[in-house]
Amino acid sequence: MGRRFKFLQKLAFLGQNHRYKALERDEVDTLIDEQYELKAIEREKAVAALPPREACKCSKEELARTFHVDLDSGLSEFAVAQRRLVHGWNEFVTDNTEPVWKKYLDQFRNPLILLLLGSSVVSVLTKEYEDAISIALAVLIVVTVGFIQEYRSEKSLEELTKLVPPECNCLRDGKLRHMLARDLVPGDVVSLSMGDRIPADIRLTEVTDLLVDESSFTGEVEPCSKTDSPLAGGGDLSTLSNVVFMGTLVQCGKGQGVVIGTGEQSQFGEVFKMMRAEETPKTPLQKSMDKLGKQLTVFSFGIIGLLMLVGWVQGKPLLSMFTIGVSLAVAAIPEGLPIVVMVTLVLGVLRMAKKRVIVKKLPIVETLGCCNVICSDKTGTLTANEMTATQLVTSDGFHAEVSGIGYSGEGTVCLLPSKEVIKEFSNVSVGKLVEAGCVANNAVVRKNAVMGQPTEGALVVLAMKMNLGSIKDSYIRKKEIPFSSEQKWMAVRCSLKNEDEEDVYFMKGAFEEVIHHCSTYNNGGIPLPLTPQQKSYCQQEEKKMGSLGLRVLALASGPELGRLTFLGLVGIIDPPRAGVKEAVQALSESDVSVKMVTGDALETALAIGRTIGLCDEKLKAMSGEEVEGMEQDALAARVRQVSVFFRTSPKHKVKIIKALQESGAIVAMTGDGVNDSVALKSADIGIAMGQTGTDVSKEAADMILVDDDFSAIMSAVEEGKGIFYNIKNFVRFQLSTSIAALSLITLSTVCNLPNPLNAMQILWVNIIMDGPPAQSLGVEPVDRDALKRPPRSVKDTILNRALILKILMSAAVILGGTLFIFWREIPENRTSTPRTTTMAFTCFVFFDLFNALSCRSQTKLIFEIGFFRNRMFLYSILGSLLGQLAVIYAPPLQKVFQTENLSALDLLLLTGLASSVFILSELLKLCEKFCSRAKADQMLPEAV
């Protein structure tokens, strides 16, 4: 109190012209507190994220000083609030932060949309308000449908995946709190336990038998042992044993550490930067639509120029001819094209969603239709990522096979070749081998999931299949010598419960290390001396199992290290996912090549490749080292012949994809790890796993397989091919109708004849009539034979030569038939009458409906695809027919459309004539089938 009183006195001093009053004690307290708070705020805001390579060198005390944190009590809420102002939330800022209005406006960047808007403006200027309103409405429908679908797709993705783990255990204000991981800031003290997903980059300060699965980050299958000791130098990220990274998983043990990086300041953030640096290529559909838009633009303006020139030569007013030219240009543009394309893509996405596949961008579905190479990661994609014991060899020569995959415990162990099922110790040698694997084990299997190392989980499940799953409880563990990459084995010293026997060691590990500690081998429960011949036999068995791609573990037991009894070998593998083999076969039959790109060894990769039918006797494999050493051009020349790439890194994967793309391939890449994300972004189609996939891989991908089912890709390819054919069907129908209408009006203008169709009739044909039938073609069910067709070339456009010929043929038939009726009905004085236009108008509409019927398939007859298969098409045709009859016979509509009643004979005549376009199209399909069959029969003897 005395010191504070003297301080107050010093504040009362004389200035030159003023006397300052002494402050009260509470005012001084407030002043001091404010100064202290300002300094505290500055100190907290100055705290920065620490790179892992620097953090790994710090001692615990240096780490605490750097982050201004008490390791025993954690940060205060005040410190957290200040640091969050600088570092933000522990999450990634994704592309989905783009404003909604901007996403909506982006839909207008399509060239067809811009052309339609231009036509609408010109229609307003020329007072063609009906056309302007119709076109504007069509544009709004297009952009709204596209916006809603992409918006819903993004929302579905947000629901499926979170960019950071949702919860964690954090020490704050001296209390351990269970909180959202997004709340973490640099300097937070986080507690980790078995099964936790690491919520941020963390420098460990305490560990107890901590093993972390970093396979999603580094590609290494085996969990990494962690320490809390400072390291001498910061090497590769995978060697930083005292740092754990966001998104990796605690397999066993527990630990505590300080957060050194959050959100985009974590190592995930570095991968995100690489991912965003990769430019996403345009899809083939986007390229085709762009080209079609340009072609239609050139065609439309050419017609305008031609008609204005003809009209000027004939002495007609230029403004009148310009109005006609613009109207014809609008008619020539298939205004339903963007709508049907969008609806077709949306329906494809919805069908795929039912098959548990989320598509982030609509055109990606179609891109799969021309995909001819699928590069797939092995672990977790082609395989189940569930290590499973499949073979046993005992030291005395018994062989057994194990059925059942995964961690459910379902399956049996059978002796070979007798197929005798073994339970417990019905075969002593097998029983002792399985017992050792279960006791020298730290994994726990619950509810079909493993807590701990997957390899150890496989041994526990093996014991469960022999009813020995609880045998570990019969022992009291007294000591453990943990596994290390240097010694390549682990051992436990145990004693039987309630029995006064000497302790026994159980050991498992690499064969060459375990056999080194053995002096005897087990022979039906009796230890015999381990002779060189016996060692050689066991070594041969180990090599034989290894050549099959199995991970081989040797097991032994005995009273002390160095005097152990060798028990035998267990072969473990990550088995293929259900349905993968069938999917690979179906894709291969449709000329889609599946390539495995993995970080595993050659033997393991080949074993899985053979199991799923990926490769044949002419298999070619290439290592990541070879990929790195080759020039890009040389790699592009060889990469198509290689089926398996092994020992690859993320950098190698990107190089492989780019080489495939340079060779002309459309590449789909599947993956689930952080190490796959850059490759997913580089590929034409990136496909991530929904369950085992990391958040970064999902963000990088274009599609997500919700159930991690590789066979769903087969359905996606089928959808992609079917969607493109549906779009071609619609384009054929729409353009043949538009060209026929355009030619009809152009010919009548050039020949100085009266117009066969008036303005309202043209509007009916182009906007109303072409809408429902055309859109129903877009929802035609996917052709069942679509998957069998080879992938479409990326150079192919929607309007290829064959389709153009069919369009021109249909347009010529429609034009010829309508002109025949018009010429038949026109009076001698060549003046237009209501009957003349009604007959020509109805004839054109009937042609339109029959043309739609023939356009349901480019190759199959109507009887093959099924008349009633597409109900929406039938409803649209029926609705259009009823609408046309209403226009002809309803008095109010007769006045609007300037029509008159037609007799039944007139309708029969028009129906018979209009059906010619359908009959001719079906005959053409028959001819094509006959020619294709004859060509195939001719090639068969040559092939033989």
Curated annotation (Swiss-Prot):
Record InterPro entries: ATPase_P-typ_cation-transptr_C (IPR006068), ATPase_P-typ_cation-transptr_N (IPR004014), ATPase_P-typ_cyto_dom_N (IPR023299), ATPase_P-typ_P_site (IPR018303), ATPase_P-typ_TM_dom_sf (IPR023298), ATPase_P-typ_transduc_dom_A_sf (IPR008250), HAD-like_sf (IPR036412), HAD_sf (IPR023214)
Primary enzyme class: translocase
Cytoplasmic compartment residues: 1-104, 149-229, 313-329, 770-802, 854-872, 925-944
Membrane topology: Multi-pass membrane protein
Coiled-coil annotated spans: none
Keyword field: ATP-binding, Calcium, Calcium transport, Cell membrane, Golgi apparatus, Ion transport, Magnesium, Membrane, Metal-binding, Nucleotide-binding, Phosphoprotein, Translocase, Transmembrane, Transmembrane helix, Transport
Keyword hit for Magnesium: yes
GO cellular component: basolateral plasma membrane; cytoplasmic side of plasma membrane; cytoplasmic vesicle; endoplasmic reticulum; Golgi membrane; perinuclear region of cytoplasm; plasma membrane; trans-Golgi network membrane
Active site: D377
Binding sites annotated in the UniProt record for Ca(2+): V330, A331, I333, E335, N766, D770
EC number(s) from the headed UniProt entry: 7.2.2.10
Extracellular side: 126-127, 251-291, 351-748, 824-835, 894-903
Single GO biological process annotation from the record: calcium ion transmembrane transport
Broad class of where this protein is predominantly found: Golgi
One Pfam entry name: Hydrolase
Regions that span the bilayer: 105-125, 128-148, 230-250, 292-312, 330-350, 749-769, 803-823, 836-853, 873-893, 904-924
GO molecular function: ATP binding; ATP hydrolysis activity; metal ion binding; P-type calcium transporter activity; P-type manganese transporter activity
Modified residues (Phosphoserine): S266
Domain of life: Eukaryota
Family: Belongs to the cation transport ATPase (P-type) (TC 3.A.3) family. Type IIA subfamily.
Main function: ATP-driven pump that supplies the Golgi apparatus with Ca(2+) and Mn(2+) ions, both essential cofactors for processing and trafficking of newly synthesized proteins in the secretory pathway. Within a catalytic cycle, acquires Ca(2+) or Mn(2+) ions on the cytoplasmic side of the membrane and delivers them to the lumenal side. The transfer of ions across the membrane is coupled to ATP hydrolysis and is associated with a transient phosphorylation that shifts the pump conformation from inward-facing to outward-facing state. Induces Ca(2+) influx independently of its ATP-driven pump function.
NCBIfam families in alphabetical order: ATPase-IIA2_Ca, ATPase_P-type
Quaternary assembly: Interacts (via N-terminus) with ORAI1 (via N- and C-termini); this interaction regulates Ca(2+) influx at the plasma membrane.
Protein name listed in UniProt: Calcium-transporting ATPase type 2C member 2
